[in-house]
Amino acid sequence: MAAMGGWAGIGEMLVAMMPEAVPPLKAVLKDTGVDANDDMMMIGAVKPPKEHAFVAAHQFRWLLSQVNYPKLGDLCWLVIPCALTALDHWSPDVKEQGMISFMHIAKNVKATELSLYEDAILDACCHNIPADDELWYRVVEVSVLLLTCTQRSNPRSPWYDRVLSEMLGHLERQPLNKERRVAWLTLIGPVFDSMGLFLLAHFRLLFSLFFQWIHADDDRTVLLVLERVHTVIKLTWIRKSPYTSRYRNYDTSYRYLLFLHLLNLEASNSLYLYLGWWMSLFFCIKSQPHGRAVR
């Protein structure tokens, strides 16, 4: 069929068809979505059955998945508004198709091509963080991917702070939900790596959750918590100091200091004591004669 139409392949044929195929799908998603303002204006109007939204979302996701880099970048103006409409839909199934669509977009489009839409996309991700359990894994997955894709070179971006704060606040309200914590601990690593030292601003909530989860009765949670604690300490540990060489060769003392550090955090759960501990450690190391270990 593609050859008969003069196209080199199916992908090229779908690219040509997108401008005609996507707008009707978006219209169905919009008409079946929940919007108070639209409901006031559409009293007495005939809306498509909700099943039409499911079909439209799956059709859009399939069409999108057939177009890859670099052709997809030229269609951002068309596909991103439709994916946002799916993401804002009331139906979990439609939302999931929107999330899958955005993951495909993020993997096949340059960050510069997403720059015009990044605020709207990340805002939609934040609004979907309090999603149902069935969608939580997808929510975290797409939020982490889009956040690191669009803000990768800017750890000072307010979006890092907002997205992580939303996630931590939501997890704080459901600390015993095993599925949510395991999914979050599994997927959040790239955000930690991108934020680096700016994780300090989130230590109060972060370590509060870590020390609740470290006592969980499932081994997977405990192992994931230990991995994330190791990542956080590695990213925020004192480095490039003239005094670090004085204890670099004392592995036992280093481990003991790390042990005391974790005990202090668990006992106090206080950001102020944590910062005070770092300052005390710094001045303790500074005052040591050269060649002696910190004890």
Predicted regions: what is each one?
Residues 66, 107-112, 148-153, 193-194, ...:
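Alpha-solenoid helical repeat scaffolds
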Residues 1-5, 10, 14, 21, ...:
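Helix-rich alpha-solenoid scaffolding regions
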Residues 133, 258-295:
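Eukaryotic acidic, Ser/Thr-rich intrinsically disordered low-complexity regions
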Residues 14, 18-70, 83, 149-157, ...:
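Eukaryotic alpha-helical scaffold "rod" segments
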Residues 12, 43-52, 70, 82-97, ...:
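Short coil/turn segments at helix-helix junctions and helix-capping linkers
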Residues 6-26, 33-38, 69-81, 113-123, ...:
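Core helices of alpha-solenoid repeat scaffolds
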Residues 198, 232-235, 239, 250-261, ...:
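Hydrophobic alpha-helical segments
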Residues 1-4, 46-64, 79-82, 93-105, ...:
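HEAT-repeat alpha-solenoid elements in large eukaryotic scaffold proteins
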